[in-house]
Amino acid sequence: MLEFEMDMDQLAQIKVIGVGGGGSNAVNRMIENGLQGVDFISVNTDAQALHLSKAEVKLQLGGKLTRGLGAGANPEIGKKAAEESREQIEEALQGADMVFITAGMGGGTGTGAAPVIAEVAKEIGALTVGVVTRPFTFEGRKRSTQAAAGIAALKEKVDTLIVIPNDRLLEIVDKNTPMLEAFREADNVLRQGVQGISDLIATPGLINLDFADVKTIMKDKGSALMGIGIATGENRAGEAAKKAISSPLLETSLDGAQGVLMNITGGSNLSLYEVHEAAEIVSAASDAEVNMIFGSVINEDLKDEIVVTVIATGFDDAENRRAQQQSNFNRQAAPKQPLKSKEKEAEKKEPRFTSQPEADDNESLDTLDIPAFLRNRRRKSR
């Protein structure tokens, strides 16, 4: 039997960096769930919170600026702290082929520092993917506004950005779920987003993908959406796939996506037929021209469960094409607009003259000075 030595340096190196409180919590959740084949980094301006992180590498941002006391929910301080620690961030990310940046948007550190970290990751040549949450509505308008600005800034710096709207989690969890549990669920969804992609590259399975496959779907693709489906029982594969494509986390249908990455994870009893069934359902829901890649991973802990994760990318390309088509259509229709607006303006100004004979109306349309003409007739009738 032939044996080959595998050089571990040749495998794609994946690093997950949790930024701020929400990001660090998500990293802890990934470590607890035994996420394999990735290196974990936790960064924060809050030294006390950083101490609770389970990541192998911990980095305090902006030691001089914040003195380890946090960013005070101010994204500008988070940004400056990351700029101060830029060299240390680069050192921590060095050697990575792929970097996941995970954060809860709306606070100070995650919102302000994540775009700076993404910029550094891109500079070292890594495929950079952001997986972040948008805050719950009950967290307040200010946090929501800060999150929107942070998401816009981060989108400019990453290859692909997956935004998980926390409000959508309320459609998944029971209405009696305690608030702390709801926040834990948000961390868990961040974990599933990262694991759904990284497992395809780093974990042995029935159908493996290489790093180049994932890069094709995710490089320079802008906005992305994620759907997760979990099912057990006789028709578990089909049900999990249907749940994934109709997941509340997907804010739109898969139709507009240019690329779809799919992960089917099950226990040792996962069959090839089940993988085929799930892939067929997701493929049928996608655009005919979509670039779809899928893989399957074995996780002994799942036993009877199947988890289907769908990442849909390239919505920005489709939106740009639609906008261009609409713009072309508007330009063609433009010459007809002024006449209609003048007619409406005349009708609004002189509503009592609508009963004039049709011939008069047609004559008046040939003149440009409609209001004056109507005013003259009004004087004569008096």
Swiss-Prot record:
Gene3D superfamilies: Tubulin/FtsZ, C-terminal domain, Tubulin/FtsZ, GTPase domain
Cell division in keyword set: yes
Comp. bias intervals (Basic and acidic residues): 340-352
InterPro entries named in the record: Cell_div_FtsZ (IPR000158), Cell_div_FtsZ_CS (IPR020805), FtsZ/CetZ (IPR045061), FtsZ_C (IPR024757), Tub_FtsZ_C (IPR008280), Tubulin/FtsZ-like_C (IPR037103), Tubulin/FtsZ_2-layer-sand-dom (IPR018316), Tubulin/FtsZ_GTPase_sf (IPR036525)
GO molecular function: GTP binding; GTPase activity
GO biological process terms on file: division septum assembly; FtsZ-dependent cytokinesis; protein polymerization
Pfam families (UniProt xref): FtsZ_C, Tubulin
Keyword Nucleotide-binding: yes
GO cellular component term of the entry, any: cell division site
Binding site for GTP: 21-25, 108-110, 139, 143, 187
Residue ranges, annotated region (Disordered): 322-382
Location of the protein in the cell: Cytoplasm
Family per record: Belongs to the FtsZ family.
Assembly and interaction partners: Homodimer. Polymerizes to form a dynamic ring structure in a strictly GTP-dependent manner. Interacts directly with several other division proteins.
Role: Essential cell division protein that forms a contractile ring structure (Z ring) at the future cell division site. The regulation of the ring assembly controls the timing and the location of cell division. One of the functions of the FtsZ ring is to recruit other cell division proteins to the septum to produce a new cell wall between the dividing cells. Binds GTP and shows GTPase activity.
Name by which UniProt lists this protein: Cell division protein FtsZ
Encoding gene, per UniProt annotation: ftsZ
